[in-house]
Amino acid sequence: MSFAGRPPDTRKRASQGIAFFRLGVLAALMVLAPWASVEAAPIEVRFAEGAAHGLLLVGLVSGETVGHGDLLQTAHGDRVESRLILRFKDGSVHDEHVVFSQQRVFTLLSYRLMQRGPSFPETVAVSLDRKTGSYNARSARDGKEQESSGSIELPADVYNGMVVTLVKNLAPGASETVQVVAFTPKPRLIRLEVTPAGAQRVVAADLARQATRYALKPRLGAALRLFATVMGMAPADQECVILTEDVPAFVRCDGPLYVKGPVWRIEQTVAR
């Protein structure tokens, strides 16, 4: 369903929440949490991002391919624009656009996410902008539309759409806790713990390489975690594998792209 052509004075404010949580490449969560920031230090730049075009496969962990994707990235000075587009065989699309700066530390400047098609339970469009201090979240399902918009002050350690970039910049063996913004439909800050989870042997052609698995765990308070579990809204853990020899490189990430969604594997591939 398209959101176009709707007069501003007829927009509906959502009364029930849906959450959109993106992990670098990747998540949408539905949670109920107060807007309360326990701000941590932003992530330092160890490896600056540059121009890149990555080819991706989208599949199930069983090996079945369900789609393909592109990671398109450009850099202008210390400003980087990164776009992840996943195209599913059934015509569904996951499209997210991140703009960030990398002057000593990584800083999220703006973020947009769009999901549509039969692979997703609803059409979703989300945007955040640090400079204007604004957000907008829209969804459509079964002919019904919901929308929330307003002002938002983003802490320095908010990193929607940048998890893979952050993991590549962690020191060997280091863990970090950052924040992401989820929508219910009003914005809520969620703490995300990123922890190394062991070595992983990967193979490129016939060459074995050493990689590291990272666990990405949303952290809720005990009472909220229990409530979210009972209500079927508990955010799922994710896992990313990063090649950690010399200069880090993305290998794959496993996790759902929406609440209660299937675990999809997004991995690097090559042109043949």
Positions of PLM-derived features:
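Intrinsically disordered, low-complexity regions enriched in polar/acidic and amide residues
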Residues: 7, 15, 145, 175-178, ...
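Bacterial N-terminal signal peptides that target proteins for export
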Residues: 9-25
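Bacterial N-terminal signal peptides
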Residues: 22-34
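Sec/Tat signal peptide C-region and signal peptidase I cleavage site
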Residues: 35-40
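Acidic, serine/threonine-rich low-complexity disordered tracts
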Residues: 41-131, 176-272
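Surface-exposed beta-loop interaction hotspot
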Residues: 140-175
